[in-house]
């Protein structure tokens, strides 16, 4: 989905290696759940200082989803 691709693009550009993360996307009706599984070493890069990076990504995805009348939830987990 375009939500998965957008998140993947940003995470890929934040991190040095595509092997240090995986992304799972689950779309049910108007709800989209995205889970970013990331290594412990790269967790800080994805979350950012005071959560700024992940917050910005969530705001961006909410804006994209709003025009499709969808709701996107992004979770970050350690792998």
Question: Which role does the model predict for each range below?
Answer:
Residues 1-45, 59-79:
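RNA-contacting regions in translation and RNA-metabolism proteins
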